[in-house]
Structures are given as C-alpha cells and as structure tokens.
Amino acid sequence: MPKGGTFTKKRKAARRCLLDVANALTGDDIQEDALIVSTSGRYEFRNKGIDVFIEAMNRLRFDESLQKQVVAFIEVPGCTAGPRQELAERLDSGRQFDTPLDMPVLTHWLHNMDDDNVLNRLRTLGMNNAKDDRVKLVFVPCYLTGDDGILNMSYYDLVLGNDLCVYPSYYEPWGYTPLEAIAFKVPCITTDLAGFGLWANTEKGAYSEIEDGVKVLHRTDYNYSEVADAIKDTVAKYSAF
C-alpha cells in the first residue's frame, strides 16, 4: 500500500485516468471534483450485486439532493473483444472532447454485445450518458492488469482514484473487494450477506455506517428496491461531505 506523497501521487494519477476516460467516451465536461464510484469483481450479475448497483445509479440520476457529478464504473471482466480504437485515439491525443462516441458507456468491445447483462440493463433503463445526466456510468469489461489498451493501470493502482466503492453482494462468503478498498483508504458499501459486512457489524456492535468507513446494508431475498434506494441515498449523502 503506497504511503504519504506516493499515495497522493498515485491517487491523483488514477483520478486523472478515470476522468479522462469518462470525458473521451461521453464528450461531457466532467468536473475535477466529480465523485468517482465503482463496483468490481467477478462478472456475477446478481450475486455480486451488479444489477442493484446499476439500479441505484439510475435512481441517483433523478435525486435532487445530489451535490456533485458522479462517474460510476463497473469493472468486471466480460467477453472482451478488445479495446475501442477510437477511444484509445482520443485518450492518446490528450485533448478534451465535447461530442460523445457511439455507445458512450463502454470502454472495450464485447463478443456478445446483444446478450451482455450490463449493456442490456443499461438499454432497458435508458442509461446512455446523455449530456444532462449528472450520473455517468462506464462499463469496463476487462481485467485491469495494466495493459488493457484503454486505462492501462492495474486494479490496485486504479482503485486509489475512487471516492467510494460499492459491493452490494447478494451472496459472498467473505468479500475481499471491500477489504481491499478500505485498505487503500476508500470507503465502501457492502451488505450483511457478505462475510466482511458481518465482520464489520460485529466489530462495531451495530450496523456499520459510511462515517465508519464501511456502510453495511441489510439485504434479503425481498428488499432489492430498498437496497437500491439505500445505495442511492448513501452516495448522495457522501457527495455532500
């Protein structure tokens, strides 16, 4: 884990990378103080809570209490066909852009564009990173090993650029991603269906809150909508910190 000045330098570089990707994709003016939020892990659409993360970001678009722009990233490896050449060219130019690319939600092409769960859910919800959307969502469907052709940073370097990580698991025996987030000084949201969430609650003696560094949500088979709202509300609250 980087410390001191090295941590600050790496966090700044990661934020710059993420904000530049968002601008190059969407053509929107992404503010320097935009709140960067992400979820990551294996591509298990329901078990990892990717579905409810997308739903929460969709609801956040219409939340009037939101104090900042939000750029949300889904970082899960899919059936990747390779980096988008036109996106790579924009990033290599070092310029800022005011027009979007086609499909301004996706960093790498997929072999299964018509069948991908994330893309289909974004289409259903009408989440296409329109100019007036205060919440942008970017799908990064590749392993972050530092040579993906777009971000070109490892996961552990990139996670430093986040302001908040969200792991709303439906099933997770332990959950290393939230543990790694807080190890890198990034607050996170998880659930009590993850072992890490249960541990955080046990340590506090009550449900852990975002002010503690880990927000633990109660999740059951029947409260999907409530979990989506709780994520939305926590991100909106965090935007005012």
Predicted segments — roles?
Residues M1-F241:
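Catalytic cores of carbohydrate-active enzymes across secretory and cytosolic contexts
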